[in-house]
């Protein structure tokens, strides 16, 4: 039996987003940044690195982490600003993560397009995107997370009535 394309939608409000702006785009920069963050016992969930702005040699790196870990990560990064050479640190505690989950995504092109279209039609901006073979996650403003979940549920038919389950019982004889 083939797995359904999408088996569920999950959401998470317990994360913060940290963006390190103006990171020198050189080998080892990300390694050093995440070694510093690891030293604070911060668990990283999603990571996005922008393409370097042409001619600047600088990039931005954003990541999400549990909201209880973000203060330590921010403090450690600020303390290492001179060593790391970044321009500024931005912090956003008002984010939510929506994840679309399903083993069937591997063999069905267009799932991400459908997800992004559903969010677009609802007027919801995406801040970060992360994918794997069985999951697509997006970060959106926390204020619209519930609306995002409803829009995606509707787009993938997860809000439809499921088939009726019929149970036949016997006497056991």
Please identify what each model-predicted range represents.
Residues 1-173:
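A conserved regulatory-domain signal marking ACT and ACT-like small-molecule sensing domains
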């Amino acid at each position: 039996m083939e797995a359904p394309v999408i088996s569920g939608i999950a959401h998470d409000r317990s994360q913060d987003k940290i963006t390190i702006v103006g990171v020198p785009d050189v080998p080892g920069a990300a390694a050093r940044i995440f070694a510093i963050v690891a030293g604070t016992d911060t668990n990283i969930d999603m990571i996005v690195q922008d393409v370097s702005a042409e001619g600047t040699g600088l990039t931005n790196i954003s990541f999400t982490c549990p909201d209880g870990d973000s203060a330590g990560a921010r403090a450690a990064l600020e303390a290492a600003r001179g060593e790391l050479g970044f321009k500024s640190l931005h912090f956003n505690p008002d984010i939510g993560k929506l994840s679309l989950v399903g083993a069937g995504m591997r063999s069905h092109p267009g799932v991400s397009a459908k997800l992004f279209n559903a969010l677009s039609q609802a007027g919801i901006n995406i801040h970060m995107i992360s994918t794997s073979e069985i999951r697509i996650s997006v970060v959106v403003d926390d204020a619209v997370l519930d609306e995002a979940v409803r829009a995606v549920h509707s787009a993938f038919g997860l809000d439809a009535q499921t088939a009726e389950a019929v149970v036949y019982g016997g006497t056991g004889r």
